[in-house]
């Protein structure tokens, strides 16, 4: 990512830079907190003891590489505001790729590179789909079907994939639009109050399972539209609200 273009508002790949990324050197954590006095990483592998992050850019970018961190571990950012009377708050990662199931709210390190898609045929034909009629089936994943074997009634992304694809194909649809799947605090909502913008809600599984759902749709000739609402964010204190103390 070009950091200069990011601050100009022109970087569309910020998720590849910010967040927690698994590398050969360990996990690299980066977050943006321009008005913070200090940012610490706290994570389960370090017994949740604060580790200072380094401010690497005048715009407020903080970074830390943890060699022993691995995918699947939980973490948060502990942000100290400049105001001495302000509260020191532990926040989830706005760019994280995974979060705990509510009411817990730690971010989870995910390695998205380990999934291999099998949708080359769909991708090769995708450009031609704009010339064809579009019939979109909008669905709220959590209420579309009830799983009698789950205490919350939810199917995982992986479990619901064949059921949903079969229904959509029989009904004559060629696209599925998923109502927001980003992490959100309330079960009763449609998902429009985000806490983890790049974290698929853990109600239905992991990012890899969501990737498998999309892959299954594509292999069946079904396009996927994700309802992504970055302008709606929850006011919960652990999320983006007052993230750097302002």
What are these regions (language model features)?
Residues 30-32, 55, 153:
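Aromatic-acidic/polar surface patches that form glycan- and anion
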Residues 52:
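N-terminal cofactor/phosphate-binding cores enriched in small/glycine residues
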Residues 122-131, 140-246:
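Substrate-binding/active-site clefts of carbohydrate-active enzymes
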